[in-house]
């Protein structure tokens, strides 16, 4: 039997609030090994919520609701569920006292409207809310239907899920075998190209392998259902090892690894330092490098040489080359990388110069054209040309440029290690 998530709130339908609750609960259900095939978002409307319940009860055995537990007239979840199952509500004096105590602790008197939060269907149990005033409930109105309700505030919902809902579900026999996943991360290769290399693994049933793509990055999820992490790793790790061998340098990390953190560890391990010279990214590369705590161990700093005069004055870029080839050129990227490496006395120097748009492009130098220079400790400089696409927006081109530059450094550090 499966679970279904029903998120209540007109603000979700209007896009005023991002529905992070559904994502969190979906991940949690997967961890518990509870099948989950449907999600529904319903506005604050009694009849539409009843229709959603009617559909859900026919195809799912655990109905998880978020939102609509507040004190205002449009908070209708509890009474609508009770009415659907033709059950009357009761006022729980203990819960009412707890709500009043929370207001008292804040030096406030409880508004009369909050008393509705102490209402619960006959036969249901409250899910305590340690931080907010809206408790949830656990209720089995029918033999094959279990209902759990949570407030829409994510922090409150998450704590209630962990402290009360998970123990309850486990006590009912759910979660004996959980789904364990490992995410392998790749850069410098597209989703389709990577999929072709590991196509034979997509037919596996234990573990399963599935690709996911995001901006400039591809992930492969390796998942299995097992009674313990140790048992899961015995199934996952051989497949992960095979994929890493196939991918080679395109593989950069797993699970919570980030590219800036991986590059930082490589620099720290090799006792080397880095500086950057940026034009079109405007400091974006330096920003992602310094997201990592302790990055001062290996990051010397950067020069944002947006103006050509700064390129000449601080990076020793040849003014004649700027005039002849333009700021967006391989020769200028080369000189920028060498210039910042020398100026800040670091082992490595990275440069980025390009056209992020939306204007400034031409037939020969379109928007999305970016040159990335990399100066090595030996004094060698390599420059790569990239065309990130005229149809991409400015922010995307800047982000891809910064991460591509960092990935170029990662590959060189691995080759030299």
Swiss-Prot record:
InterPro entries: CinA, CinA-like_C, CinA_C, CinA_KH, Competence-induced_CinA, MoaB/Mog-like_dom_sf, MoaB/Mog_dom. Belongs to the CinA family. This is CinA-like protein. It comes from the Bacteria.
